[in-house]
Design a protein with these regions (language model features):
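Acidic, glycine/proline-rich low-complexity segments that act as flexible tails and inter-domain linkers
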Residues: 1-68, 104, 282
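Well-ordered secondary-structure scaffolds
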Residues: 3, 7-14, 152, 170-387
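Short acidic, glycine/serine/threonine-rich loops at helix termini
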Residues: 72, 96-100, 131, 138-142, ...
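Phosphate/diphosphate-binding glycine-rich loops and adjacent basic-rich segments that engage nucleotide
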Residues: 121-168
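General beta-strand structural signal in soluble alpha/beta enzymes
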Residues: 60, 85-89, 109-112, 127-130, ...
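Active-site-proximal beta-alpha loop/turn segments in soluble metabolic enzymes
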Residues: 24-28, 137-147, 176-186, 217-220
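A glycine-rich helix N-cap at a beta->alpha junction
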Residues: 100-126, 196-203, 207
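Glycine/serine-rich anion-binding loops at beta->alpha junctions
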Residues: 56-95
Length: 387
């Protein structure tokens, strides 16, 4: 295998598909080897620019991906009370921290090293995208994995997750593990725990302290699904709109993730004011404004002109994989037309899984561009099931 030869350690854009196939096949077909995965992680991390924070204790809460969590936006706002948080993010499917914050006009995700250091020095937290500067080989290898049936290989998943942390000198990680049959970190809780043990072995070799928070990716963690909807959810939380479902996700899930690293929980009365303060500070430090945030929120809210109602009485089920894939497919259509982080559709659930629904009762509201309305309606009938 050419894992450590000169060609892999040269410029990331010079690596061939054959070399990537060798790497992926070797790791897929071999017993788990933490030393090999740690070695690959270092190569990926050092394929571009790197950050160093000699005098700061750094931390991050990355996730394994899933359609309904707000953790990559909310958790850093709490975490920065204890650590410096240089958050190198990736695009979500359908709504991750990077692409959600990108909806705010002026918010700068493509930061230089100098800008990152300045913002961290000033506020302890910034959120940015690789932009082919940080761990670019990881981005290239991820694209190859996605296209060639290597996406869910555990060793490759672990190397990819950790390479982005090593590149920006993260010393503490709580991995938000979302397990499901359509995820990349275990089909079940037992599988996810086993993979987390492997993750910890590798992270320890890299000098990173790691903890974990597990959730079932087949369940809706909160009801706002989409890029604009994620900002609307945050705004509703700020305004004290009573939504126990949303509040539990923010005040329990996101707060609990942070506490795995700090062994301390911020009191609930104080939590909201901290999140509001740090969210506002971050938006303004990275070039956005509260006014632009509120404008996106209002536009999203006003666009929810459609309603989906139950065609019969029964128990509500949601096919989370089909829901995710439907939204991502529509997003991809507009990304191909030159929009880097398009936001053409979204959902707000009024009912949760396993609730008893009456015929004609509203299950959710949604927004979608007119060109995609009929397709979206058809797909809704496939991923919303009443038994």
């Amino acid at each position: 295998m050419s894992l450590f030869n000169s060609s892999l350690n040269s410029k990331y854009d010079e690596i061939s598909k054959l070399e990537m196939e060798e790497i992926c096949s070797d790791i897929k077909n071999s017993p788990f080897d933490e030393n090999k995965i740690a070695g690959l992680t270092k190569v990926l991390a050092k394929s571009g620019e790197t950050l160093e924070f000699f005098n700061l204790d750094t931390a991050d809460i990355p996730s394994t991906g899933g359609p309904s969590s707000l953790s990559t936006i909310i958790s850093p706002l709490i975490l920065k009370e204890y650590f410096a948080v240089p958050k190198l993010g990736i695009v979500g499917r359908p709504a991750g921290g990077i692409d959600v914050l990108a909806q705010i006009q002026g918010y700068n995700l493509k930061l230089s090293k100098k800008e990152i250091y300045e913002i961290i020095d000033k506020t302890q937290y910034c959120h940015f995208i690789s932009n082919n500067h940080f761990a670019p080989l990881d981005s290239k290898l991820f694209k190859y994995r996605s296209e060639n049936n290597f996406k869910n290989v555990p060793g490759l998943v672990i190397a990819s997750l950790l390479s982005k942390k090593v590149a920006v000198d993260i010393k503490n990680v709580c991995l938000d593990v979302r397990y499901s049959h359509f995820g990349n970190f275990g089909n079940s809780l037992d599988e996810a725990i086993k993979l987390s043990d492997n993750f910890k072995l590798v992270s320890s070799l890299l000098g990173i302290n790691s903890t974990f928070y597990f959730s079932d990716n087949t369940k809706l963690l909160q009801p706002y699904i989409g890029r604009g909807e994620s900002l609307l959810a945050i705004h509703e939380y700020f305004l004290d709109i009573k939504n126990n479902w949303l509040n539990h996700h923010i005040e329990y899930d996101c707060r609990e993730m942070v506490s795995t690293l700090t062994n301390h929980k911020i009191d609930l009365p104080e939590l909201k004011s901290i999140i509001i303060k740090n969210f506002t500070e971050n938006i303004e430090c990275q070039g956005g404004s509260v006014g632009s945030f509120e404008k996106v929120v209002q536009k999203t809210k006003d666009s929810h002109i459609y309603e989906f109602s139950a065609k019969k009485s029964g128990i509500l089920r949601i096919d989370m994989m089909k829901m995710r894939d439907t939204i991502v497919k529509i997003q991809s259509k507009y990304r191909d037309k030159g929009h880097e982080f398009p936001d053409p559709c979204g959902l707000i659930f009024l009912k949760n899984q396993k609730e008893n629904i009456s015929k004609n009762e509203a299950v959710l509201t949604f927004r979608v561009l007119e060109n995609d309305l009929e397709y979206f309606k058809d797909e809704l009938n496939k991923f919303i099931i009443i038994d």
